């Protein structure tokens, strides 16, 4: 009941620091989802597909996920208003990679996402939402 005003659910992952690791695991998943969503849209655009139809079809199958449903349509409309700032996401990816290194883990997909978001932030787009990653693709911008 203590957290009712600020949370719909409360989860216990273990001792101090475990919740932070759970958040980093979530951010690792989002990194893969956002890079995949970006490349799916770029590929579909290059192939001349109806991107709205593609979002509908992919969203009703195995590729369905929150980012696709919520950010996909916004990306098509050019709406990069942040739900979560890219610069803050980059910070989280760096924390996740630092923690992974301490555990002797290699996370190559997360490393790639970190590089992509670092480039986005370096070009002055850190205040866009995470879905703004699509703006970094030359084909998306120039097609």
Predicted regions and their residues:
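Acidic-glycine-rich active-site phosphate/pyrophosphate-binding loop
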Residues: 1-18, 66-72
């Amino acid at each position: 009941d203590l957290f009712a005003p600020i949370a719909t659910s409360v989860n216990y992952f273990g001792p101090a620091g475990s919740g932070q690791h759970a958040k980093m695991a979530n951010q690792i998943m989002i990194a893969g989802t956002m890079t995949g969503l970006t490349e799916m849209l770029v590929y579909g655009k290059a192939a001349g597909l109806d991107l709205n139809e593609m979002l509908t079809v992919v969203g009703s199958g195995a590729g369905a996920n929150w980012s696709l449903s919520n950010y996909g349509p916004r990306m098509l409309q050019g709406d990069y208003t942040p739900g979560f700032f890219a610069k803050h996401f980059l910070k989280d990816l760096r924390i996740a990679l630092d923690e992974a290194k301490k555990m002797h883990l290699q996370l190559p997909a997360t490393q790639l996402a970190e590089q992509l978001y670092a480039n986005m932030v370096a070009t002055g787009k850190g205040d866009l939402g995470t879905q703004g990653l699509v703006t970094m693709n030359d084909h998306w911008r120039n097609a």
